[in-house]
Amino acid sequence: MARVPGGTFRMGSDRHYREEAASRLVTVDPFWMDPRTVTNTEFAAFVAATGYVTVAERPLNAADYPGAKPELLTPGALVFHMTEGPVDTGDISNWWSYVPGACWRHPEGLGSDLTGRGDHPVVQVAFEDATAYAAWAGKELPSEAEWEFAARGGLDAAEFVWGDEFLPGGRHMANTWQGPFPWRNFAADGFAGTAPVGSYPPNGYGLYDMAGNVWQWTTDWFSAVNPPDVASPCCAPENPRGPAMEASFDPAQPRIRIPRKVVKGGSFLCAPSYCRRYRPAARHAQMVDTGMSHIGFRCVVRDA
């Protein structure tokens, strides 16, 4: 594992998406972090050792999804599909579909498998799946503050994990989307989907893929409203853990009472024209029960 030294840093951003504000001073203790996201091979070892069944492989409870069509209550997960041309990017159903049978073993559905993807990040894992793996490995998932501090790699004020220039010297530093989203990906960075973990340079703490490739689970409940900044570094909150669970429910879907966690880092689907979230400050809300083809995780070990 890689050592993350801890310290006081400026979390969030006032220059991008509203849910990233306010930029504020926060302190985290030192800890250890997996240098790479958990791979398919590593997750398979966990399943083989424990017999664990992921959330995407279990039947759904109709009471949790009022009004859902019966075909959407069979085990499965959300799968990205490239569109045939330009679409309304305000409607994610244009490129996300619930696919019965999709799970970590079959990321795109029953016709897919993990052949040649052993060293790719495991996806289609819900929050419960990630925490189960972490417990088996003797580890935990990071808080949002821990994750963001680690992602910055010592570059507290930089926009990206590696600095302020997105393509330094024309070099791709992360697995993101190049081209008009979601209908054409030029794959100029070498990958149209997930990439093997560690395909791009590490940050200052020796951590790979802290931007792009796959979003990563954290333990914090999501709220679009963050605490205000403090007047002095001496007053910075120490090891914050986010709001209460009740704050995380989606106000746009009041009938669905599935809480949401913060995911960080962006993914191979993030594009400058649509989702410019391949930055340390970026964050997104994710329902805890939902696996998707662009969400994975990595673990931490905190000092005793």
Q: Each predicted region: which residue ranges?
A:
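Acidic-aromatic/histidine active-site loop/patch
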Residues: 39
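A short N-terminal beta-strand-loop micro-motif at the entrance of redox/enzyme domains
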Residues: 25-31
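Short, structured beta-strand segments at or near domain termini in extracellular proteins/domains
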Residues: 293-304
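Functional-site microenvironments in short loops/helix caps that host divalent-cation chemistry
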Residues: 3-4, 10, 14-15, 59-280
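Short capping motifs at secondary-structure boundaries
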Residues: 31, 46-55, 137-138
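C-terminal, low-complexity/hydrophilic appendages and adjacent surface loops
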Residues: 18-21
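Short proline/glycine-enriched turn/loop segments at secondary-structure junctions
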Residues: 251-255, 284-291
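An anion-binding catalytic pocket shared by soluble metabolic enzymes
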Residues: 34
